[in-house]
Amino acid sequence: MATACVKSLESVQCGTCEKTIANGTEFYALLFDKHPDLRHYFKGNENLTGADVKKSDHFKKQGQRLLLACHVLAHLENDPASFKAYAREIVDPHLRMSVHLEPKLWSEFWPIWLDYLSTKESVDDATKNAWLALGKKFSDECLDHLKNLGQPH
């Protein structure tokens, strides 16, 4: 399972060159264009279009953080303790910045991720199922962490 996720990331590398930065901003452009109902989580950026997002310095950085998180999760999937610890480390900054996501979004992210990934390469059923399984493990840990913190879960 982890191998399929890691292999699929070859087309969406992190980095500092124009192409790799675009990998991250293109995810957020897709999110803003196809899921405008989620824009309210991006305070101060709610009215941006996908085209605006691609030019935003904020989303250039945020896109790299998101890509890096997906890379790290895929590489840690066969190390359950580290995978769970990293999932918790993703939740904590959201709480510190008062970005209280609806609990269902921790799992609903993954179909959006797959939609984006399919713009970069052909995503076969094995890869799709691998990402959805990873996403379920991730979401389960995020929700457990939120529960332990007394947050909505």
UniProtKB/Swiss-Prot annotation:
Keyword DNA-binding: no
Annotated PROSITE patterns: GLOBIN
Molecular function terms from GO: heme binding; iron ion binding; oxygen binding; oxygen carrier activity
Protein name as it appears in the record: Myoglobin
Keywords: Cytoplasm, Disulfide bond, Heme, Iron, Metal-binding, Oxygen transport, Transport
SUPFAM superfamilies tied to this protein: Globin-like
UniProt domain Globin: residue ranges: 1-147
Gene3D superfamilies: Globins
Subunit structure: Homodimer; disulfide-linked.
Tissue expression from the record: Body wall globin is localized in cellular compartments belonging to the hypodermis, the dorsal, ventral and lateral cords, the nerve ring, and body wall muscle.
Positions of heme b binding: H94
